[in-house]
Every structure is written in structure tokens, then in C-alpha cells.
């Protein structure tokens, strides 16, 4: 096995192709990575490179918008929308007792893209609200939804 300072790269190609023994092998690698490193990269996942690239480009385009445009999509009570720099503080540490600083991260949170007449949206079910989409970013929604669907498909194949 690798040193704990290296982030493991798990190649799913054989597993996704259904090769004999691949399930047991990738399970062992995943278990090691999760228990000993805490992080891992996935390769051989079958998500088209052009979709990954288009998604990164869509993200760059969103984050390049003026702050006012992004704040018009401020994260709501469903945790859907934009969270600007300094909008959150990590409180996860049970050991650190010093002053906590705000996170220097900006993020745009989305959920499964549900239609406006979906029962969870109509009934305002917590964390199941409608996504907030920026205006004027051609292809942003389509690219983002395609990527989320690809990731969901990958996740389901790994269950």
C-alpha cells in the first residue's frame, strides 16, 4: 500500500466493465483509502472528459459574475444557492478551542433539479426546494444538470 501522505487514485474501469474480481479489488482499495487516508481520487469512472471540462468552465463563468449577481441567488433555507466568501465558520473540531475564522470559500449549492410542481417543492419540504439558476449564463443549467446526472449514475453503479 502507499504512504499515508499520498492521495490514492481508485481506477473504476475494471469494476464498471464487470471484470471478474474487480469488485473485491476496488472495495479493498476504497476501504483502505477511507480508513487510512480519508480522501481519494476516482479515475476510469466513465464520465466524459468533455462534460467534466464543460462543468469546470460553467463554474468559472458563474464565479466570475459580479458579487451582486451571485448574491441575488443567496443560499436559502433549503441550502440552495450562493454562499459568498466568509459566509460560514467551520465548527466541526471538537479539539480546537481557539478563535475560529470564517471560511475563505465561495460555493454555489444545487440539489436534484425538480420541476416546480413536484410535491416536495409545492409542500416546501426542507432541503428539497427548487434550484436557483443564474440568468444569462447560456448552457449553465444544462451542463450542470448533465454533470449531476452523470455523478448520480456513477454513485448508483458503485452501490
What positions do the PLM features span?
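Peripheral, non-catalytic segments flanking oxidoreductase cores
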Residues: 1-159
Amino acid at each position: 500500500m502507499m504512504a499515508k501522505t499520498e492521495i490514492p487514485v481508485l481506477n473504476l474501469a475494471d469494476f464498471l466493465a464487470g471484470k471478474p474480481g474487480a469488485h473485491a479489488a476496488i472495495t479493498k482499495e476504497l476501504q483502505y483509502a477511507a480508513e487510512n487516508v480519508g480522501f481519494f481520487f476516482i479515475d476510469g469512472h466513465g464520465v466524459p472528459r468533455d462534460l467534466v471540462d464543460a462543468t469546470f468552465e460553467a463554474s468559472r463563468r458563474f464565479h466570475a459574475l459580479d458579487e451582486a449577481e451571485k448574491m441575488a441567488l443567496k443560499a436559502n433555507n433549503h441550502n440552495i444557492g450562493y454562499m459568498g466568501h466568509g459566509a460560514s465558520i467551520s465548527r466541526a473540531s471538537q479539539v480546537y478551542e481557539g478563535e475560529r475564522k470564517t471560511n475563505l470559500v465561495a460555493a454555489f449549492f444545487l440539489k436534484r433539479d425538480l420541476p416546480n410542481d413536484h410535491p416536495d417543492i409545492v409542500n416546501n419540504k426542507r432541503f428539497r426546494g427548487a434550484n436557483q439558476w443564474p440568468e444569462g449564463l447560456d448552457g449553465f443549467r444544462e451542463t450542470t444538470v448533465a454533470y449531476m446526472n452523470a455523478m448520480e449514475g456513477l454513485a448508483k453503479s458503485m452501490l
